[in-house]
Regions:
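Conserved, mostly hydrophobic/aromatic
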Residues: 8, 39, 47, 92, ...
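Conserved anion-binding
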Residues: 11-15, 19-23, 90-93, 97-169
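Short, acidic/polar
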Residues: 28-40, 85-90, 142-152
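Glycine-rich, proline-tolerant flexible connector loops at the mouths of alpha/beta enzymes
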Residues: 46-64, 104, 163-172
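Short, small-residue-enriched loops and turns at beta-alpha junctions
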Residues: 54-59, 108, 132, 141, ...
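Catalytic cores of alpha/beta
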Residues: 72-100, 111, 178-215, 230-235
């Protein structure tokens, strides 16, 4: 089970939002590349990068920063935010990104995801409010449930589902263990949890989720690390102990 330290980009800086609210932003640094290197040096096996500006507008305003991170770190980079078409995805792969997360476009154009997943590593972002998948930077409800969308992509060849509980994101109040277990149970696709992690105990609880011998593939965490709740090394160790 992998730990994915998160770097959320807005105006080229490392930030975190509270419950996906662009009006509740905390800036944690103005050198995302240095932050990514620090995460990798501390033992992270992946770096998770989100372009928050692109997630809202579809314009890849931080693509150069994403490319600089991918070029600098010795571990694979997973990135999402505003990947609305094949050209945008290919630009990220060309920049050295290992896996692209597609959210809004996955619901609007499922065939785009299926075609891209045929020859690239793709994850589908399932960002939910009260069980409903949200799109366009978490601002628009889709009318579809997480389980419905997950099942619709079960045979699409995607690498993973990144499941985020928007109401918990940036709160440090703990992840939605029940909802995550339901997604693991519903499809054979790897599931990466995101949102709400605040303690080492939360990581251990996530590592204990198991259905039919399957477990979560990973967990994304940002604020807990930035706020000093635990270090990357401690997080990695917690997941290794329980896996």
């Amino acid at each position: 089970m992998d730990l994915f330290p998160a770097i959320d980009l807005r105006n080229g800086k490392c930030v975190r939002l509270h419950q996906g609210d662009y009006g509740q932003e905390t800036v944690y640094g103005d050198d995302p590349v240095a932050q990514a290197l620090a995460f990798a040096d501390a033992g992270a096996g992946w770096i998770h990068v989100v372009d928050l500006d692109a997630a809202r507008t579809g314009v890849p305003e931080n693509r150069d920063v994403v490319a600089a991170i991918a070029a600098a770190v010795p571990v694979p980079v997973q990135t999402g935010g505003g990947v609305r078409n094949r050209a945008a995805a290919l630009a990220l792969f060309d920049a050295g990104v290992e896996r692209v997360v597609v959210g809004t476009a996955a619901l609007a154009d499922p065939d785009f995801v299926r075609d891209l997943a045929a020859d690239h590593r793709v994850a589908v972002g399932l960002d939910a409010k009260a069980g409903e998948v949200a799109t366009d930077g978490w601002l628009v409800g889709s009318g579809r449930s997480v389980l419905d969308v997950a099942r619709s992509f079960a045979d699409a060849g995607v690498d993973a589902f990144v499941v985020t509980d928007i109401s918990r994101d940036g709160t440090l109040e703990g992840p939605d263990l029940v909802g995550l277990r339901e997604v693991v149970e519903a499809t054979p696709v790897d599931v990466i949890a995101s949102g709400g992690v605040g303690t080492i105990a939360d990581l251990r609880a996530l590592a204990e989720i198991g259905v039919g011998g399957r477990r979560l593939a990973g967990v994304i965490t940002g604020k807990a690390i930035y706020e000093g709740r635990f270090t990357v090394a401690e997080g990695v160790a917690a997941l290794e102990i329980e896996s």
